[in-house]
Amino acid sequence: MTNDSYFNSEEFLQTLHSYEEAEQEGRAAYFDSDTLADIAEYYYTDGRTNDALNAALKGVDMFPGAMPPLVFMGRYELLKQNNPQKAEWYLEQVDDQSEPECVYLRAEIMLVENKKDEADEFLRQQLEWQDDAERDNFVLDVADIYLDYDLIDHAQEWLSMVEDTQSTDYQEVLGRIALGKGEYQQGEEIFKKLVEDNPFASPYWNQLASSQFLSNRIKDSIESSEYSIAINPNDEEALLNKANGMFSLGEYEEALTYYTRFNNLHKDDETGEIFIGITLINLDRPAEALQHLQKAEEMAVPRSINLVEIYQETAFALSRLGRVDDALAYVNKAIATGNGNEDELTVFKGHIQLENGNPLAAQNYFLEAVRHSKSAPNVYFRIAISVYDNGYMQLAYRMFHTLFQSVPADWKDGYSHMSLCCKHLNKESEFLYFLRKACELNPMEAKTILGEYFPKDLDPESYYNYITKQK
């Protein structure tokens, strides 16, 4: 991938100007395959997908067999259109299949097709052809690919083949693996060391922010994001990390500001529009949320992994606007993708009915979900949350009591809601019991649900002591 500094260089901008001038005048001009691929990537990162494809396809037509434009088209088909067959069609046209970009793309096609063993065997065969000087780089690239597909064990196995374990690239992959395994403290220590050694490296600050966010140290995560933003105000990952942090703290207006900044830069897919829509729903601005979610739906490719979330959030917005039938239709669209939990989505239909004053219709959907799921705890939990959200505190209290008697030992959700039920029902001792449990087991949920009852800067771990000292 060409880096941003090259796209901002005088050399590239002059080439881009010449290309655009020739396009506007409709005259032929010579640009080599590498340049056309660079222009395509520049347009793509700027959200100008049609212009990007036009430039890349010019390269494909003018330079048959040239790697850069063909790999660009292959990656576009694989990662954005979710079409591995078309991606492979472009890849097969490359003359030199030994190019690293071709090797990596072929492996990714196999991974998308869920052929993990074939991909690993192929990559190990390619490793045998690597020069000693390039071996570590190849291994680290493969580990990175596996991390991108959440194949943590594969990434760790490949990382063990690296000889130079002191390099920053090795340490970065080691840190990412730690985060992927849930070892957030270890990951944070690795990225802290990396930012100490490379204080102006935004990617390390971003990874540090992620490790702190996953450890529920939201304020530290925001601070790390701010360092990254200070280095590069247009760093998409840093802006997104800060937005996520502010959202987690319930600072929705501030989160909206940073999601909007992210969205203005990240134009190649619908992600930013989704985040803005969700935030606007939390700000009780459903009409505005609907506009952004509909734009996200328009931007999404037919098989986008984001479609279920888009349909669900659109249904939320429509329900808030009292458009029950339209909301239910969107839930059906989410079910039709085959990628959502049908029982939980059926509960969501019940929530829409309950939110709009139709308790009998809601009950029918809830019972349908319970029967179909054979009383699965996650389904019962979602029904209890819906009942709670709609103000039926006595019923929610009973449902949470029933739920907590049947959940597995590692269950962490809903204790914050139960503590508030107890508070509203004047069950003081139970309120304190569930408050303590909520803050110990799920501090992020506690912050979201209980935060308004405590000082803004107080960490959830301190809620119980704060309350007991007030008595």
Question: What are the residue ranges of the model-derived segments?
Answer:
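Single-residue signature of alpha-solenoid repeat helices
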Residues: 52, 86-87, 119, 155, ...
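Structural marker of alpha-solenoid helical repeat scaffolds
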Residues: 62, 93-97, 129-131, 164-165, ...
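Start-of-helix register in tetratricopeptide repeats
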Residues: 34, 68, 101, 134-137, ...
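TPR/TPR-like (Sel1-like) alpha-helical repeat modules
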Residues: 95-100, 128-129, 164, 298, ...
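Register position in tetratricopeptide repeats
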Residues: 45, 79-80, 112, 148, ...
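Canonical positions in the second alpha-helix
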Residues: 59, 92-94, 126, 158-162, ...
